[in-house]
Curated annotation (Swiss-Prot):
It catalyses: tRNA(Phe) + L-phenylalanine + ATP = L-phenylalanyl-tRNA(Phe) + AMP + diphosphate + H(+). Keywords: Aminoacyl-tRNA synthetase, ATP-binding, Cytoplasm, Ligase, Magnesium, Metal-binding, Nucleotide-binding, Protein biosynthesis. Its main location: cytoplasm. Transmembrane segments: none annotated. This is Phenylalanine--tRNA ligase alpha subunit. It comes from Gallus gallus. Its cofactor is Mg(2+). One of its GO terms (biological process) is phenylalanyl-tRNA aminoacylation. Belongs to the class-II aminoacyl-tRNA synthetase family. Phe-tRNA synthetase alpha subunit type 2 subfamily. Mg(2+) binds at residue 417.
Length: 443
């Protein structure tokens, strides 16, 4: 069995003289063993965890390395020399010279070194000629010295110039100076990290070496502080609405009057949904203090006598029922308020509204029903809207949500006509499930 990296390091360290002067540089040791430096660093840290087997002191050294551009110059020569060699004895049009690779930098450097001259009055336009017979590529020679490990022989001015031209990089290397510890040994003894039931039962734990606790380790981050799945879905839905040009409606009133929750939406006062078995009514305050008088009169007339193409429900509409406070059963009450305020503006402006908030129902609790849940609401107000516009908007919304297989089924809502239920095909359940309700508001 071949020795491990840690064992190879200990064997090499054993041959070093004792005392503070003896030891190994991790960079030199990695090169001598033919290993990647990070692999050797891992072995050093493993040996440090064993106790006083070794001592490791962190050191930092700086060295110069060629950049990607520097590697190119080392291989092909500097831009100024390449341009000089590209200029024939009869000269070269400046426009052609500028098309060569690295010509911009090469031309300025060659002109500064007085290797080339520019004749602006030459026939056919400015022309470049050689000003000397031959040149030496000092930049390439300097980079070759760095590549061969002799970068220290370069002057500070030469290094600064190469660095400014982005041909040279100053790299800081972190390494370790490794020495023998007080408990040095070439044999690596495996330390136990877990106390198992078998060790306790057999008593073998008494003779086994255990790894000491590392109280400086960060440990695993605690699994807490995550967003609730409902908040994640809410954020996703909100982003989809905003991408489609919708504006969020204010929905900060969990307590709503029966007028806005039911009556303004053409829901009769004898409707089963308004019964205490389906709705949470408030005892204090039991009634809403104010309702818009003119609008309430129009709503009362439509319920009692009809209007706007409707026959009404033909019953005695009571303001006492409309004033009753409740926990809103849907956020469509917010849509009714928003449309009411839109109508009062005088000049009509097309709008798109949405809301995502809690609603409350006096439901029997089971696996699929809660007394409190979230409703996603969207409303579009414009002239000339049709059922096709509604279906297109729904298709766009659900497609952004990742639901593309949709079906629309005719339905009845008190406040919309026509109305549709929206179904999506569930790949897991292998059936169509209802995902929404929709319709065109009665005018």
């Amino acid at each position: 069995m071949s020795p491990s990296v840690a064992e190879l390091l200990l064997q090499r360290l054993e041959r070093t003289p004792p005392g503070p002067e003896g030891g190994l540089c991790s960079l030199e040791a990695a090169a001598a063993l033919g290993l990647d430096h990070q692999t050797l660093v891992g072995a050093v840290k493993s040996l440090q965890a064993l106790g006083e087997v070794i001592e490791a002191e962190t050191r930092a050294t700086t060295r110069w390395e060629l950049s990607a551009e520097g590697e190119e110059v080392l291989r092909d020569g500097s831009p100024e020399v390449r341009l000089f060699r590209s200029v024939p004895s009869e000269g070269l049009p400046q426009s052609d010279a500028m098309k060569l690779p690295g010509a911009q930098v090469g031309f300025s450097k060659a002109m500064a070194n007085k290797w080339l001259r520019l004749d602006k009055g030459a026939p056919g336009g400015p022309r470049i000629f050689r000003a000397v017979d031959a040149v030496q590529d000092v930049v390439q020679s300097s980079l070759r010295q760095v590549q061969e490990g002799n970068g220290g022989s370069l002057s500070e001015r030469e290094r600064t110039d190469l660095k400014r031209r982005k041909l040279l990089l100053e790299v800081t290397l972190k390494s370790y100076w490794i020495r023998k510890g007080s408990a040095f040994s070439t044999a690596v003894v495996r330390q136990e990290t877990d106390l198992t039931p078998e060790m306790i039962a057999t008593g073998s734990w008494r003779k086994l070496p255990f790894k000491a606790y590392n109280f400086s380790a960060l440990g695993l981050p605690p699994t807490c502080g995550h967003l609730h799945p409902l908040l994640k879905v809410r954020s996703q839905l909100r982003q989809i609405f905003l991408e489609m040009g919708f504006t969020e409606m204010p929905t900060d009133n969990f307590v709503e009057s029966s007028f806005w929750n039911f009556d303004a939406l053409f829901q009769p006062q004898q409707h089963p949904a308004r019964d205490q078995h389906d709705t949470f009514f408030l005892q204090d305050p039991a009634e809403a203090p104010e309702l818009p008088a003119n609008y309430m009169a129009r709503v009362k007339k439509v319920h009692s006598q009809g209007g706007y193409g409707s026959q009404g429900y033909k019953y005695e509409w009571k303001v006492e029922e409309a004033r009753k406070n409740l926990l809103r059963t849907h956020t469509t009450s917010a849509s009714a308020r928003a449309l009411y305020h839109l109508a009062r503006q005088g000049k009509f402006t097309p709008v798109k509204y949405f809301s995502i908030d809690r609603v409350f129902r006096n439901e029997s609790l089971d696996a699929t029903h809660l007394a409190e849940f979230h409703q996603v609401e969207g409303v579009v107000a414009d002239r000339g809207l049709t059922l096709g516009h509604l279906m297109g908007t729904l298709q766009q919304f659900f497609t952004k949500l990742g639901i593309s297989k949709l079906r629309f089924k005719p339905a009845y809502n008190p406040y919309t006509e026509p109305s549709m239920e929206v179904f999506s095909y569930h790949e897991g359940l292998k059936k169509w499930v209802e995902v929404g309700n929709s319709g065109v508001f009665r005018s």
